[in-house]
Amino acid sequence: MDQEYFIGFDVGGTKTDAVLFTRDGEIIRHVITPGANPLDVGFEEACGRYLHAVNALREGLNVPIRCVYGAVACLEYFKTRATDFMKQHVPEAVVRLESDGNCLISAMIGHQDGACMICGTGSSLCFRQGEAYGHIGGWGYLVDSCGSGFVLGKKALLAIARAEDGRDGPTLMSKLFEERYGESMNSHYEKIYQGGRPYIASMAFLVFEARRAGDRAAGKIFDECIADLSELVWTGYRRFGGAYQLILNGGVFHHYPEYVQALRAHVPPQVTLVDSDAPPVYGCAVEAMYDAGYSCGPEFKKKFLSGYNRD
């Protein structure tokens, strides 16, 4: 059988992680290009960036592409428009572009029913049931980003502000803030507003470090955020009608294992929490293979990750 070639790419707000690979999992080319959340940069600009990543993979290589699969943050609001765009530029391939939850699920359990919970700057629970796909929570930081790094950081800043006002008692988070940034929060306001959501999310460490030292305010924030995240899991439990597998992904879960431990203690025992050990773009590869009628076994994953990590 002639060799077959596939493209998978994962798009976030910061970067696009794209791979060209073969049917047996060998990565031929791996590129990192600028991110392209269509809500951030606009739909036309975003599509141009997706195409740039695909062209960077194909440059100088005259190989036919069997399938193209792209996972893109916030693409669910644009229906099939991005897929239709890409089909025009890779007409020989089966093309599917969709939101980024499915690839996280597939990276760990293959193309089957399940869910993933992302907890980084933002948060949400994405689910897949047959052909149905959607999310619970994750309506953006202006509406709902429960338990996320941004919410943790924002609540920490509010606790510090309340302590400085005298509305609440002192909190260790004030001291930790000054140690990290070299000035009080009151003197740091310009930088906070300039940095915006990602900068505030980076301050989530205040909650975890202060909580470990027994700080009451930090403990309260931690518990509130765990309650919000567990609500997402319980809502998923009702949607699935019982047990399901939940893949955990995102920087907050990765850096703060106590957050995962606390979540485990507050969700239904029938829900299996699975720590992700593969990058989202591997899930894109699994989905591209699925569109060609192939499943990905252990050898495929081993070869793919070996090539990916080497890059």
Residue ranges and their predicted role:
Residues 6, 10-11, 69, 118, ...:
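Short glycine/serine/threonine-biased micro-segments
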Residues 75-171, 305-311:
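Phosphate-binding/catalytic loop of phosphoryl-transfer enzymes
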Residues 1-65, 84-90, 108-115, 158-311:
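ATP-binding/phosphotransfer module of carbohydrate and carboxylate kinases, centering on a glycine-rich
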Residues 72-76, 250-253:
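Short loop or secondary-structure boundary microenvironments that flank
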